[in-house]
A protein has these predicted regions:
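Generic structural marker for isolated residues within well-ordered, non-membrane alpha-helices
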Residues: 23, 117-120, 150
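Short, cationic motifs built from Arg/Lys/His that form the positively charged side of catalytic pockets
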Residues: 19, 32-34, 73-76, 90, ...
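Conserved tyrosine-mediated DNA breakage-rejoining catalytic core shared by Y-recombinases
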Residues: 39-86
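A short, glycine-centered helix-capping/turn motif at helix boundaries
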Residues: 20, 26-40, 146-149, 159
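Basic, Lys/Arg- and aromatic-enriched nucleic-acid-binding interface segment
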Residues: 2-34
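DNA-binding alpha-helical recognition surfaces that contact promoter or target DNA
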Residues: 39, 139-143, 155
């Protein structure tokens, strides 16, 4: 609420030189929980024979997984030539890595969340609400819901059932 439509891009740009630059991009593009970033997220580009194009792939290992809840593994994919600025930024980042592969892992989930709040405050000092890692997650879900069905968003967030869809 009350943020520009580019708020994720703005936060990622502000944090681009910091130690969480990669994690910010991953959080914005997957809706991953900070604890999932602490586990580590694999990112790579591969050629998809069916689509006949390069695909940016992100593999998230779920953390809220039990026998009857959660997705143990999630894959999020974007076309490498997607013109979304966050996809383009991650593709550019991968271009400097051998084999266009990268493992993004943070040391502490709490520190990452604190850094997002710090970056947001530096951009929007007078904003009424705290901007947290959960905001990235909710925005990712809203984006998926606007272009697909709600069940796809629930699965992408790691929920096993649409019943656990809260946003």
């Amino acid at each position: 609420r009350g943020l520009p439509s580019t708020w994720r891009e703005d936060i990622c740009a502000r944090g681009m030189q910091g130690k969480y630059a990669d994690a910010l991009l991953i959080s914005a593009l997957t809706g991953a929980r900070p604890s999932e970033l602490a586990t580590g997220i694999d990112v790579w580009v591969e050629f998809d024979e069916l689509l006949r194009k390069n695909i940016l792939c992100l593999h998230v290992i779920g953390v809220k997984v039990k026998a009857s809840q959660g997705q143990p593994n999630r894959f999020v994919a974007y076309a490498e030539d997607d013109d979304h600025p966050l996809v383009a930024a991650l593709v550019k980042r991968l271009s400097t890595e051998p084999g266009k592969k990268l493992r993004v892992q943070i040391a502490k989930a709490g520190n990452f969340s604190t850094e997002i709040q710090r970056l947001a405050r530096s951009l929007w000092r007078n904003h009424d609400h705290a901007i947290t890692a959960t905001c990235f997650r909710h925005q990712w879900s809203a984006d998926v819901k606007s272009s697909a069905d709600g069940d796809a968003a629930s699965r992408g967030l790691g929920h096993r059932s649409a019943k656990t869809r809260g946003h």
